[in-house]
Amino acid sequence: MDMAGHEVNSSSSSSGAESSSSSSGRQQYKKRPAGRTKFRETRHPVYRGVRRRGGAGRWVCEVRVPGKRGARLWLGTYVTAEAAARAHDAAMIALRGGAGGGGAACLNFQDSAWLLAVPPAAPSDLAGVRRAATEAVAGFLQRNKTTNGASVAEAMDEATSGVSAPPPLANNAGSSETPGPSSIDGTADTAAGAALDMFELDFFGEMDYDTYYASLAEGLLMEPPPAATALWDNGDEGADIALWSY
């Protein structure tokens, strides 16, 4: 009886160990979910058929070909999203048979119907559609660049023509004109001449230089006059001498 109970307990414990090991194995090797784990949105939020390409900030254009399931038409890479959107409009106009063929509803810009010169092309000739779209976009960008350059040049001409010379400043005497460089130089020359005239004084009166130097020579040859008698020779030493006598 005891042996039978012991066998039952051992079998139940072994089955419990096997079930726990199998459950731990299932938890360890859990199956990964299928599908993409990371999705990066590159489509432009506004323009149709435009998406970003790479980290350089360039934009590509790709449109669906109407009437062909899964067919797409590659239109190239552009610097700006607006240019890629214009390429999309040009391709849709060409594929729809012109601006009045129902392609105006799929345009990114409504003015592309008359700004883009796109000839109608057959949807089967995708190479011709691509060529017509790229030529139309290139012509539009060239015209837009020329127009913007001309407007900028006109604005620059107007700005420069409106600039005039500043009015002359009034001097302290109330005159409306300031003396020019020539008048300033003339005033300086006049002042310098007056200063020189101040030093050219007539020290000798009617006497010329020859007579003046001759008189100096005669003065050197003459004997000097006798010296005046000193006061202490009069014998009045120690006496008070009045400076003034009335």
UniProtKB/Swiss-Prot annotation:
Residues 10-24 have a biased composition (Low complexity). It comes from Oryza sativa subsp. indica (Rice). InterPro entries: AP2/ERF_dom (IPR001471), AP2/ERF_dom_sf (IPR036955), DNA-bd_dom_sf (IPR016177), DRE1A-I (IPR045277). Pfam families: AP2 (PF00847). Residues 1-43, 155-187 are annotated as: Disordered. Residues 172-181 have a biased composition (Polar residues). It comes from the Eukaryota. GO terms for cellular component: nucleus. Keywords: Activator, DNA-binding, Nucleus, Stress response, Transcription, Transcription regulation. This is Dehydration-responsive element-binding protein 1H. The keyword Nucleus applies. GO terms for molecular function: DNA binding; DNA-binding transcription factor activity. Belongs to the AP2/ERF transcription factor family. ERF subfamily. The gene is DREB1H. Transcriptional activator that binds specifically to the DNA sequence 5'-[AG]CCGAC-3'. Binding to the C-repeat/DRE element mediates high salinity- and dehydration-inducible transcription. It is found in: Nucleus.
